[in-house]
């Protein structure tokens, strides 16, 4: 995820690729 907040969140829950889906939804 390009977003710092989502990136940190992904690291906490250890989502990984799922973060990209959320990131795209947030950015676009």
From Swiss-Prot:
E.C. numbers: 3.4.24.-
Expression sites (tissue/organ): Expressed by the venom gland.
Bilayer-crossing regions: none
Positions of disulphide bridges: none
Cofactor info, note text: Binds 1 zinc ion per subunit.
Swiss-Prot/TrEMBL cofactor(s): Zn(2+)
Keywords, in A-Z order: Hydrolase, Metal-binding, Metalloprotease, Protease, Secreted, Toxin, Zinc
Localization annotation: Secreted
GO molecular function, one term: toxin activity
Entry GO terms, CC: extracellular region
Coiled-coil residue spans: none
Enzyme kind, highest EC tier: hydrolase
GO terms for biological process, alphabetical: proteolysis
Family of this protein: Belongs to the venom metalloproteinase (M12B) family.
Protein name (Swiss-Prot/TrEMBL): 50 kDa venom protease
Organism of provenance: Proatheris superciliaris (Lowland swamp viper)
């Amino acid at each position: 995820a390009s977003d710092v907040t989502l990136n940190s969140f992904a690291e906490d829950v250890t989502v990984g690729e799922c973060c990209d889906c959320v990131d795209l939804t947030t950015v676009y």
